[in-house]
C-alpha cells in the first residue's frame, strides 16, 4: 500500500491508480535552449525516484516528460547563435539525455516536443 500526502485535502491518502496496476505520470521537462543546470536535473532525479518506487511496488509506469522547444528564451538563443531553433533544440536534447544518463536517471517512456502538439 502506498500512502501519499494530498496537499488539497491536507490529509494522507491511500494511493489508488485510475487503472489498476498502472501509473501514468506527466512531468513538465526542460526548455531546451541551453545545457541543463541543477534546477533542470532536480525534477528529473526526483520523479525518477518516484517512478522507480512505483515500479518496485509492481506498477507498470507510463512516464511522459516533455521538451519545451518553443519559448522566448529559445528564440533569443537562436538569434544569438544564428542557428535554427531545430538545430539548437536537437543539440540540447541530446545533451540532456547524456547529462541525466550520467546521473543514472531512466529515460521517460515518451518525451514529446511541445511544437509537435500545438
Swiss-Prot record:
Keywords: Aminoacyl-tRNA synthetase, ATP-binding, Cytoplasm, Ligase, Metal-binding, Nucleotide-binding, Protein biosynthesis, Zinc. Gene3D superfamilies: HUPs. It catalyses: tRNA(Cys) + L-cysteine + ATP = L-cysteinyl-tRNA(Cys) + AMP + diphosphate. One of its GO terms (molecular function) is metal ion binding. Belongs to the class-I aminoacyl-tRNA synthetase family. Its cofactor is Zn(2+). A motif ('HIGH' region) lies at residues 30-40. Coiled coil: none annotated. Pfam families: tRNA-synt_1e. Zn(2+) binds at residue 28. The lineage of its organism: Bacteria, Bacillati, Bacillota, Bacilli, Bacillales. This is Cysteine--tRNA ligase. Disulfide bonds: none annotated. InterPro entries: Cys-tRNA/MSH_ligase, Rossmann-like_a/b/a_fold, tRNA-synt_1_cat_dom. Binds 1 zinc ion per subunit. Monomer. One of its GO terms (cellular component) is cytosol. One of its GO terms (biological process) is cysteinyl-tRNA aminoacylation. It is found in: Cytoplasm.
Amino acid at each position: 500500500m502506498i500512502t501519499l500526502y494530498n496537499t488539497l485535502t491536507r490529509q494522507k491518502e491511500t494511493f489508488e491508480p485510475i487503472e489498476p496496476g498502472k501509473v501514468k505520470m506527466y512531468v513538465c521537462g526542460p526548455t531546451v535552449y541551453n545545457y541543463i543546470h541543477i534546477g533542470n536535473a532536480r525534477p528529473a532525479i526526483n520523479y525518477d525516484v518516484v517512478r522507480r518506487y512505483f515500479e518496485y511496488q509492481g506498477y507498470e509506469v507510463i512516464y511522459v516528460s516533455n521538451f519545451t522547444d518553443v519559448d522566448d528564451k529559445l528564440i533569443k538563443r537562436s538569434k544569438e547563435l544564428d542557428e535554427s531553433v531545430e538545430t539548437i533544440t536537437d543539440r540540447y536534447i541530446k545533451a540532456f539525455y547524456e547529462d541525466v544518463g550520467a546521473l543514472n536517471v531512466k529515460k521517460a517512456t515518451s518525451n514529446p516536443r511541445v511544437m509537435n502538439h500545438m
